[in-house]
Amino acid sequence: MKREIITTDSYGRITIPSDTGNIWMNEMELVELFGVIAPTLRAAIRAVYKCRVFNPLEAEKRIKLPNGYYADMYALPMVVALAFRIDTSGAATVRNALLESLCRRKE
């Protein structure tokens, strides 16, 4: 599976890949991106599912890792929903970058 991730550089700039259809991020990548701990991220994911914003079959995928374990991967719509659900400086930076790239594409 080819996938892209949203990254932050050492200066706090967010890099969003142009191929948004292949953006899938795992829990640790989201924890680092938003600057939260794993239980906070899991609670936000549960809250998004509880509000019935997304069906888990649409926003989540489980892939098998080379070591035999499985990892949950979250699609771009879930990443966007989490960015607006979580209240941290990392999430605010992601929100601003997403809105900026959205407005830039319309022009």
Residue ranges and their predicted role:
Residues 50-51, 99:
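Short, charged/polar low-complexity linear motifs in solvent-exposed/disordered segments
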